[in-house]
Structure formats: C-alpha cells, structure tokens
Amino acid sequence: MTSLISRTGRVQSWIDDPTSRLPVSCTVFVVEDSMEGPNGIEASWRFVSHALRFGAGCAVHLSKIRPKGSENGKGLTASGPVSFAKIYSTLNETLRRGGVYKNGAVVCHIDIDHPDIVDFITTPRGELPWIKRCVNLNDAKWKDADQTTKDALIYGIRSGDIWLNKIKHDKNGKRIRGNVCLEVYLPSRGTCLLQHLNCGACKITDVSKGFVEGMRDLCDLHSKTGVDSSGEYLPSETDRQVGFGLLGLANLLRQNNITYEQFGDALQATNDGIPGLGTAGLLAAEFYKGIQGAADVAREYNMDRAFAIAPTASCSYRSKDLEGFTCTPEIAPPIARSVDRDSGTFGVQTYNYGDVEIASEVGWDAYKKVADELMYMLQHTGLLHGYSFNSWSDVVTYDEQFVEEWL
C-alpha cells in the first residue's frame, strides 16, 4: 500500500547510511560581530562547511556585523556584512560539488534596518552567485524604513534576487531565525527534521491518522539522530522542534472531486466552527482533527514548534498518490499536470500529476484562501513554524501594498 508519510531524502539517506548526510534538513547560524569566538565570523565558516558537507541547508544571519566603514575603536575598519556574504557564496560553490548529492543551499539574511541594507539588496547577482539573499522585517521595521530602502527592496523582489522573511520570537520572547526556505524558525545552531503527510496517498478517513502517525514517527526520530556529536549543532535535549508538513494536496482534492475553491470555503467554515457541507466539509473536518491530534503528539514530546509547510519538490517526485501519479509539491496547485526535472545529477526526468487542478484553473484568490485557512488552523495549535509561501508573479503586483499585506 502507498505510504501515508513521505520522508525527506535526507532522512532516508541517513537511515540507509548514518555515516553520510545527516537527517536534518536545515540549520541557522547567527554571526556575532567578531572574527573570533564560538559564534564569530571564523566560526561561521566552519559551521557552514559542516552543514553543507552533511547535507543541510544553512541560513546565515548577518545583522549583528558592523556596517562597512565603521571603526571598532582599535584602529580597524569593518568591511561590512556583504563582504563576508561573498565568502559563504564561495564555500557553497566549492563544497556542494564535493560528494554524493551533498547539495545544500546557503541563504544570507539581514534585517531591513541594518545600515548596509541597500548595499546588501543591490549587490549584483554575479558577485553572490551561490547564495540567496533574504531581508528580515516586521511591521514596525517596515514602517520605519526610508523610501530608498523600500524602493530597493521592491525592485529586488521583482527581479527575483531578494526573499522576505518575517521576524519572529518564541513563546519566551527570544528571537528565532528563518531557515533557508523560510518555513522553519530556529535558534542559532538549531536544526530541524522534516517529514510530510502524503495527502495523495490518503482516503479522506486516512488524513487524521496520517497526521498523528507522521508526527509521532518524526518526534521519535528527533531524539535518535545524534546531530550534536560534532559540537556544531545544538543537542536534541534543548533544541526542541520538528517540521511536519504536507504534500500532494492537489492529488487528494482531485481524487475526491473537490476544487480548491470548495476546499477553501470548507476550511473557513470549519475554522469558524460551522460544520462544512458535502465531501469538502468532511475533508476539512478531517484536517482539523488530524492537526489537533498531531499537535497533542508534539506536546507529548515537549516540542516548541512542530508544523512547517516546506517546498517539497524533490520529496514529492518520489511520492505517489492512490492512482499511481506523482504527488504535487506542498499545498499549491501545480503550474502544469506534468513537469520535467532537469538535474545535472539525474538528467531529465518527467513526472505526471494526473488530472489535478492547475494554477490557471484554480486562480490566486482560491489558492490563497486555502493557504490562509490552513495556516490559521495550524497557527492556533501554538506549534507552527511557517509556510514557504510563493507568490504568483504573473498575477501579483510587487509594491508596498504587497509587502504590507504579506506582513
């Protein structure tokens, strides 16, 4: 029978060979404003090297580094965070090529109120070819940003060079940092295991069971990885989070003749405490039941955060629905019913999703409603990391209003 759970390639590789890639998908490092020290700039180079060599995506947060041209009081002048971003780009270019599928990613983050923010945003892509750039912000920081910064940021988003990340804090008020794909929030040196409910492999009555079983399996694995043995990552005893998410939603909806629009309405009714009607209502209720059950499991394991909707393309390609079609990534409708994956490692492979609703048929509003209502459901568990949410550039206008609505 098709598995209800889709493991990440990292987890499966680790199970098959614990000496190779580690099972954690992502990690973060907050760089202190010092060359030396356990969390200084030099330490960050070793940390990024370790993450890449063992298969994790690494987010490097640079906001604590002094701006370019400032002096440290000892006669030394700072070169600024952008100069160090170039080193991480070179590390990624070199190390990701040296091993079997150790193709981790690096994203450099900086807060919108850093003095070097415009330099960070406008650095030509050719100078930072092997990293992504992300700007961290919240309502207050956005409102305080000057017009030059806002204009540069909007242009960077439009051109595809800049990602946005919401500034978040944990339940104790301590800041947690966005990972590479922006769906997981971690303390510095923290890591996260990811796993997904294969919605396409579920009948409606399987959904809640899949949520609970998948979360329990993931939480049980969390204590067994030993990822802290190198001294680079936090130990599982104190680093308390996992990321359980979804893929193949479009397949599940197709198999039950439910449209995205119908499912969004049913989710909204469920969140409002109104029993949904028809098959869509039954499915929405099953999602609610499953999410609550999975949250109870995560609390049993004392997890601080436990849900994350990740960009699951590679994992979805290995996942099948009940009719044998490839499962679609995460919860969004696909652009087309088949996709060609052109990989330097595996060559060109074609995957067929079956007769699912595609993005042009669903429409932005219907998809966003499904995303918003699912996020509302997950948020109210108190255990949500986030969703690696992609806007649709052909229907969305990137302007200040876009940023404000996103915030």
Please report, for each region that a protein language model flagged, where it lies by residue.
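Long, C-terminal-biased catalytic regions of enzyme "large/alpha" subunits
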Residues: 1-407
